[in-house]
Amino acid sequence: MSGNTLGTLFTVTTFGESHGPAIGCVIDGCPPGMGLTEADIQVELDRRKPGTSRHVTQRQEADEVEILSGVFEGVTTGTPIALLIRNTDQRSKDYGNIVETFRPGHADYTYWQKYGIRDYRGGGRSSARLTAPIVGAGAVAKKWLRERFGVEVRGYMSGLGEIDVPFVDWSHVHENPFFSPNAAVVPELEAYMDALRKEGDSIGARIDVVASGVPVGWGEPVFDRLDADIAKAMMSINAVKGVEIGAGFDSVAQRGSVHGDELTPAGFVGNHAGGVLGGISTGQDITVSIAIKPTSSIRTPRRSITKSGEEATVETFGRHDPCVGIRATPIAESMLALVLIDHALRHRAQCGDVETPTPKIAGSAT
């Protein structure tokens, strides 16, 4: 398995399995001299960890992070930063009934056909449990971006199943388990999830992420365009089946006179491009949306096959999120931050001294 590393200058390599002794990552390329403690990382991990409400998996993992290297006396040294998170609440017996069968919608079948072996316990390497070290690495990236450039990366749930969640205020996001920016919708979301859980079914979600304060110039055309790398990173998150940047698929119905964001001395008029033009950041907010599919592990009986190709019926009884999107907001934020820090360092390496006579305009003219 060779696809375990994200990034070019700021790289993150994850390791571990869902029911192994531990999971973690190695961060390479982090600039030296930044203050960093385990508490800086833990605050982000606590936003993602399981067992925080009745609407998510009841697997009780503290997700306590250990910094093993790369930090001396509370400051990054520029050497690889190793983060370790120990698994403490594995319950592998829940997966005994899928040793010889494949769960529909999961990576069981594809991992088996590709590698000829698979860790059936909680999905092994394909489990969303492996997003915890991504959030840990994202905490490091967020801190550097915020301190060096004033960049803020924030996200929220904008849709759960058939329920739209209109944005009201960022302050609402941290006050409920759904990361909803609209407190008035939370009771409806709770009732929806309670009914779904009783049915033994699952549902998808939409998550929106915004990076503000990103300067103009980040991105490496043509094959490492900023939006291309963002899309790749987001699609690397478990269960993500779609990515939009800016107006996204709504661009199809927009005319050029509407979609093209005009430039004025006072700033841009509109942001249909989502903060990226030609693969390079414009200085506007970078806006990203992801579509997350329904959880594949459900109690509803589903048709499948055994390893020998015979018909089988699969019911999954483990502790699973009825909607993985509920805990996806900090994961999506982290992925965006990891792409941004990598491109910030790449831009500094080649074009850090470039100056033009044209003034940098504001992200919004209003």
From Swiss-Prot:
Required co-factor? FMNH2
Keyword DNA-binding present in the record's keywords: the answer is no
**Catalysed reactions, semicolon-separated:** 5-O-(1-carboxyvinyl)-3-phosphoshikimate = chorismate + phosphate
Keyword terms: Amino-acid biosynthesis, Aromatic amino acid biosynthesis, FAD, Flavoprotein, FMN, Lyase, NADP
Source domain of life is Bacteria
**What's an example of a GO molecular-function annotation for this chain?**
chorismate synthase activity
Q: Where does FMN bind?
A: 125-127, 238-239, 278, 293-297, 319
Q: Which residues bind NADP(+)?
A: 48, 54
Query: What InterPro entries does UniProt report for this protein, alphabetically?
Result: Chorismate_synth, Chorismate_synth_AroC_sf, Chorismate_synthase_CS
**What's the family?**
Belongs to the chorismate synthase family.
Summarize the subunit comment: Homotetramer.
Q: What does this protein do?
A: This reaction introduces a second double bond into the aromatic ring system.
From the Swiss-Prot or TrEMBL record, give the protein name: Chorismate synthase
Q: Which organism is it from?
A: Burkholderia cenocepacia (strain ATCC BAA-245 / DSM 16553 / LMG 16656 / NCTC 13227 / J2315 / CF5610) (Burkholderia cepacia (strain J2315))
